[in-house]
Design a protein with these regions (language model features):
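Secretory targeting and sorting signals
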Residues: 1-15
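Beta-strand-enriched cores of mature, soluble protein domains
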Residues: 20-399
Length: 399
């Protein structure tokens, strides 16, 4: 995947909550993973675009002792320029005894096969001891295993708060894959001016990958969980808070949703220092734009970024996936992932919104991580449709 440099004129950053000094703790370690199962759910898109792959595995230390589990949730974004390769939106998570660590990137891998090349992926968050994690994961194949080298920081000080919800509506949409892989459960909780939307994708028996967006009057928070259940009564679920918008722009941490899905406990760290403004333009991209998948409609495109609206100076490439899900409790959840590839690094933007921005309204999504000059990046990017084939992007980020 190639990209060119971002050169953007300064723009005025939107007002942000006052920043406080933060205490960071560095964590660096290596583990090994070995895939034990790999299941593909095909939806019939050209060149496998839109196909969902769930990979499960075990995590060991250098001595070979089992120390955790791995789950990767992968969607094909586009065909690679290379023969017999494809570009994949890859969400990696490992669960160790003291928490879960999430990473995400668009990776180039052999078509329909496991990864073989070295990948450097942004660490986007975590739970437990890894709450608020931001940094990088280096993943390299060694024999029948993968070396996974983590290098990240976590916030030492986080502020606690609570939210409550009066009503919760949910619905499940099923496909025909074994073990229900790819089935989707949508939920929406509402309490006064606060609400949340969750999208749970079945990753195996008793395993769900869950994306969740909390909406308040002043901003939103985007979170992710890997839920493992052995049956029985419902339990509270911990989520990694990957980023936010509005007054929560740049925030990271952890939230816990209780067993009845009506009470939420949050531990959040706000960014320190001053945010950097950023701006560019994007074309509408090309690719698959209307593929039926379980629970919704999939879009997978790749496109170009420019310094100005005249498109004379290219500043990078981007890759995007988006699923517009079925309506739940009167709203339509739209889950979007964008990887922006600049010459000096990559930036991952993701989140759940209730509009795609094609109605003329600007849409803000969290920055959840990056590589190179954007390692550990947090903040937000706002998209505004200038015309049918041009988008204006403005934002701010901390790192």
């Amino acid at each position: 995947i190639t990209a060119t440099a971002l050169v953007a004129p300064p723009v005025a950053a939107a007002p942000a909550a006052p920043s406080a000094p933060t205490a960071l703790v560095k964590k660096s370690f290596m583990v090994y993973s070995k895939f034990t199962s790999r299941q593909v759910v095909a939806y019939g898109g050209a060149n496998n675009v839109g196909d969902l792959t769930i990979t499960q595995g075990v995590v060991t230390d250098a001595s070979g002792k089992n120390v955790g589990t791995l789950t990767a949730v992968v969607r094909v974004v586009a065909q690679s320029p290379k023969k017999d390769a494809e570009l994949r939106d890859t969400q990696s998570s490992i669960t160790l005894k003291d928490g879960t660590i999430f990473a995400q990137a668009v990776n180039e891998d052999p078509k329909g096969k496991p990864p073989v090349d070295l990948h450097i992926m942004p660490v986007t968050g975590g739970t437990g001891a890894y709450a608020s994690a931001r940094g990088t994961l280096l993943m390299r194949k060694i024999g029948d295993k993968y070396l996974m080298a983590y290098d990240f920081f976590v916030e030492k000080d986080m502020k606690a708060s609570n939210l409550s919800f009066d009503t919760v509506a949910s619905k499940t949409v099923t496909g025909d894959a074994p073990q229900g892989v790819g089935d989707v459960t949508l939920a929406r909780g509402v309490g006064g001016d606060d609400s949340y939307i969750s999208i749970a994708t079945r990753a195996g028996t008793g395993i769900d990958s869950i994306d969740l967006q909390v909406f308040t009057a002043d901003g939103s928070l985007f979170a992710r969980a890997m839920s493992r259940s052995k049956g029985g009564a419902a339990k509270a679920q911990a989520y990694a808070v990957l980023g936010g918008t509005g007054i929560y722009s740049g925030y990271r941490g952890e939230l816990t949703l209780d067993a009845n899905a009506k009470a939420m406990r949050l531990r959040l760290a706000q960014p320190g220092g001053n945010a950097k403004p950023i701006a560019w333009f994007e074309d509408a991209g090309k690719g698959v734009t209307d593929l039926a998948v379980t629970g919704g409609t999939f879009l997978g495109v790749e496109g170009e970024m420019f310094q100005k609206a005249d498109r004379k100076k290219k500043v990078g490439d981007y890759f995007a996936t988006q699923i517009a899900y079925e309506e739940i409790d009167g709203v339509t959840p739209i889950l979007t992932m964008l990887e922006h590839d600049f010459e000096t690094g990559t930036m991952i933007v993701s989140g759940i919104t209730t509009t795609a921005g094609t109605d003329g309204a600007a849409v803000a999504r969290p920055i959840i991580g990056g590589t190179g000059d954007y390692i550990g990046a947090s903040g937000q990017v706002t998209s505004l449709e200038e015309s049918a084939d041009l988008w204006r992007k403005t934002g701010r980020f901390w790192r």
